[in-house]
A protein has these predicted regions:
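A short acidic, Gly/Pro-enriched loop at the edge of an enzyme's catalytic core
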Residues: 102-111
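A short SAM/SAH-binding and catalytic strip from SAM-dependent methyltransferases
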Residues: 110-123
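Class I SAM-dependent methyltransferase SAM/SAH-binding core
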Residues: 48-50, 54-100
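Conserved class I S-adenosyl-L-methionine
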Residues: 1-42, 56-60, 81, 141-178
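Short alpha-helix
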Residues: 179, 191-213
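Acceptor-substrate binding/catalytic loop of class I
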Residues: 144, 148-151, 183-197
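A short glycine-rich, Lys/Arg-flanked "PGG" loop and its adjoining helix->strand segment in the class I
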Residues: 124-139
């Protein structure tokens, strides 16, 4: 199942409004933490951005000297906006499901993905495809919703008191992997829950070496900007992993060019 909720008009507009608000979790937590995992110097690199969305990150990588940036997203609306707003001679945008990428062998120095992997049903398939098009010793860096956040099988994971105050986060059904339907901007958004060990062991089994793992939480100063962030210190909202392809990694990904 390849889900394309971002071309839903209601969802798209709600998401656009969310991203235009620079005090949300993406801007004050996910993006800074993700950037901390990137190489200091992107000059001359060939970069693949999976789930590129509006293309902001692609534009940033190109402006920092990347020789080529390819942004992939399943959403026609996202790709259209990216082409309009974040054009650059070193950027190419491709409207394609992440699950269907088929770039040439050892094409990229760096493969990046921000908050997209929890929408993917077959993680192993995607990792094999990434491994194939990643150069030896190249890096995969990705973020996703934390397994603690995706485990619940109810729409809202917070247990609240009679006044609606958030008392604690419900952690249940952690080892029951698979589809989750959650209410986020619209009802019944499909995500895929995997345990921490499944995510890491799938990476290792595909031939990656895990270099660094982050479970970022907001700094207290950020709560001044957004008071709701104090609740995000009570459980990890995001998981971020930096993994490296070794010299002896096998290649089982399809070889056709998109």
């Amino acid at each position: 199942l390849k889900q394309n909720i971002y071309d839903n008009d209601i969802f798209y507009q709600a998401y656009l409004d969310l991203r235009l608000n620079s005090t949300g979790l993406n801007d004050v937590l996910e993006i800074p933490a993700f950037r901390s995992l990137l190489p200091e110097n992107l000059t001359g690199m060939r970069i693949l951005d999976l789930g590129c969305g509006f293309g902001q990150a692609c534009s940033r990588y190109a402006s920092q000297g990347a020789a080529k940036v390819i942004g992939v997203d399943i959403s026609k609306k996202m790709i259209s906006r990216a082409k309009q707003i974040y054009r650059h001679e070193n950027i190419e945008y491709v409207c394609l499901p992440i699950e269907d990428i088929g770039f040439p062998r050892e094409e990229f120095d760096l493969v990046l993905s921000s908050l997209a992997f929890h929408y993917i049903a077959d993680l192993k398939n995607v990792l094999e495809r990434i491994l194939y098009c990643l150069k030896n010793n190249g890096f995969l860096i990705f973020s996703q919703e934390h397994p603690v956040a995706t485990a619940k099988q109810i729409p809202d994971g917070w247990c609240k008191n009679e006044n609606g105050e958030k008392m604690h986060w419900i952690l249940d059904d952690y080892n029951d992997e698979g589809i989750r339907k959650q209410n986020w901007l619209i009802k019944d958004v499909i995500k895929y829950h995997r345990t921490m060990s499944t995510i890491m062991n799938t990476l290792i089994g595909c031939g990656f070496k895990i270099v660094k793992v982050l479970e970022p939480t907001p700094i207290k100063e950020a709560e001044i900007i957004n008071k709701d962030l104090k609740n995000e210190r009570r459980r990890p909202p995001f998981l971020m992993i930096k993994a490296q392809k070794g010299q002896s990694s096998t290649h089982s990904c399809r070889r056709e060019r998109v």
